[in-house]
Amino acid sequence: MGISRDALHKHRLTGAARKCNYKKRKYELGRQAAKTKICSQGEEKRVRSIRVRGGHQKFRALRLDTGNFSWATEKITRKCRILNVVYNATSNDLVRTNTLVKGSIVQIDATPYKQWYETHYGVVVGKKKSAKKDGEAEQVVKKSASLLAKLASRAKGRVLDSAIESQIGEGRFFARITSRPGQVGKCDGYILEAKELEFYQRRLQKKKSAK
């Protein structure tokens, strides 16, 4: 038995070394960190199951490429690709090595959310207005009266933050991981919005300017 979570090997408050009066116990064992990484090109996700105390199962994710991320203001969740880790309050090494842990700030693919938004509200977002070329005609999609009425009712309550819209244009969202990939084998979280997004954007800007 290697890693142990006991206090027997710790020094006393006085600085004296404790005398070990019993051997390591099974219930005090520790395991190595999963250090979940993002899958490289063409690599499959890797999740291992571990039998733990009480006969339960833990799922140790070693390689992941996707996760379920929720968009709170729109009350939707979509499975999307994780692109890279951009910030971690604990350690810069976890950012450098693209390690997925709870609380990490990652960039995710915005395409699934963009597709849903455009279908749900019937508007085009994140696209720069460009001059039409000669002979280029707009595609007209026929919509039923009931669908137009539905889209009109949805448009009344439609509010899209400018920061979110610019991210949709870039094709990337900032998101926070809320699950524990090394324990549950999944990388789930939520999209950053409003003041929380502003806070992390400031932190990232500060980090860039310090280089």
Curated annotation (Swiss-Prot):
GO cellular component: cytosolic small ribosomal subunit; extracellular matrix
Pfam families: Ribosomal_S8e
Keyword Ribosomal protein among record annotations: yes
GO annotation (BP), single: translation
Membrane-spanning intervals of the chain: none
UniProt KW keywords: Ribonucleoprotein, Ribosomal protein
Cited InterPro entries: Ribosomal_eS8, Ribosomal_protein_eS8_euk, Ribosomal_Se8/biogenesis_NSA2
Disulfide links within the chain: none
A GO MF term: structural constituent of ribosome
Key word Lipid biosynthesis present: no
Family to which this protein belongs: Belongs to the eukaryotic ribosomal protein eS8 family.
This protein's name: Small ribosomal subunit protein eS8
Gene source species: Dictyostelium discoideum
